[in-house]
Amino acid sequence: MIYDVAIIGAGVSGASAAWQLSQYECSTILLERWADVGFGVSKANSGIVHGGFHHPVSSLKARLEIQGNLMFEKLQYELDFPFSRCGILVIAFSEEQMVTVRKLYEQGIANGVRNLEMCGRERLLELEPKLNSEVVGGFFAPNGGTIEPYRYVFSLVEGAGRNGVELLCNYEVTSGRHNGEYWLITAADGREIKARHVVNAAGLFADEISRKFGAEEFTIHPRKGEEYLLDRNSQARPERVIFPVPSKESKGVLVIPTAEGTTMIGPTADPVDDKLDTTTSADHMQRIVSLVRQMVNGITPRDVITSFAGLRPVLDTEDFYIDRSEKVPHFIQVAGIQSPGLTASPAIGEYVKDLLKTDGLMLVEKTRVIRKLPPRREIRRETPEGLAGLHAANPRWIHVVCRCENISEAEIVEAIHKGHTTVDGIKFYTRAGMGRCQGGFCTAKILKIISRETGIPMEELTKKGGNSRLLAGRLENTVVAPMPEK
């Protein structure tokens, strides 16, 4: 089969393009190098829907950010992912910082952002009582918010799949060759896909994919951001996303009330050489906690329950690169999608669709499109009456597997049947393992459920695919944990 479009990379950009294309009469396949979608850049970021004031409208990233911001209510209604338009506060603690605050406010106004509000100290404390009382001023962007990025990607891909888009995970592209009619896309394991048009949405590896297809030469510079998750009961949780005055390299260390009720602080912004370097450090944690204490009241190091790091795919221009290739035919570049890429992603999907149309792809709207996913059932959101009804239909609904986040066996099974068969895939789909104990109580139970539902032996199950096995093997009838590396 020759597909009309092959999208390389199933993160927010590739998944958004797939969702757009799924509404047209064209055959599309989504190729992902990792074991599940969203396992690259998209799984580890701040989860913020930005407010359209950080970048000048002359940049592509600003234009798509502003457009994408306005698309989330409709998407959330259709695709059922956690999203909260809680608003953003940008705060200053000196008159010197207020100069930058005013510039950002004026830039937002120039960009066409509505309802921005300059605030004095009293108004800021009214909007967010947990702010440090020494705050001088700032502004409020009510159109900002938060989103759960991995659930967002899962929903986009599920929605696209229900409308005919195919998905191949564990498909690491090693070469692309055009024969005058179509692209032959080869994977590391020898599999081949044929497609008339290719979209390069490969995140950190977009530069490598571009070279493998003979397209433009550019370099992705990984910039690491460490994030720290606070206990759900932390006294430091604000009602709004809190931004400090930004630097040239970063929007600063933020305090983020996540869409699912936890609190996150970070990120850092450190250039690294290794595109797979997701290590975190105690020194960075202490520095971030110290910076956050200057912004909000109530945080202590004991609140931190885990850390993680993500890598931003940065181009020398610090802007997005989304365009048709000028070197090879029918090849669309979607590269350098760092912040505010998550916010811009719905608009990126539309932008890519329009580029493909310009590139010669015939796009005829389908007469029937499944636009709305069935609503998710989650016991932590059910009424007693609703839970009783679920239990009557399936006893697994009252078997709690993850106590910290209140996740039932039925929810785990649903995730598995939707293709999430790694521990991280289950975690990102259901939140099992994201609470205070970080999987200490539920991981063994989850492994047993995955094995039961898939038939895969427990010792072959992985945390995130590849060689990330959690168990070393069996001793008679006992599963043995691997020895720690020295």
Name each region found by the language model.
Residues 23-44:
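Glycine-rich FAD pyrophosphate-binding loop
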Residues 56, 63-66, 91-100, 139-158, ...:
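Short beta-strand to alpha-helix junction loop
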Residues 139-197:
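Helical element adjacent to the flavin cofactor pocket in flavoenzyme catalytic cores
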Residues 4-30:
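N-terminal Rossmann-like FAD-binding beta1-loop-alpha1 element of flavoenzymes
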Residues 47-127, 252-253:
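Dinucleotide-binding Rossmann-like beta1-alpha1 core, especially the glycine-rich loop
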Residues 408-419, 441-459:
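Iron-sulfur (Fe-S) cluster-binding segments and ferredoxin-like electron-carrier domains
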Residues 250, 259-260, 271, 276-401, ...:
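C-terminal catalytic lobe of FAD-dependent flavoproteins
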Residues 16, 176-181, 186-266, 270-281, ...:
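Flavin-dependent oxidoreductases
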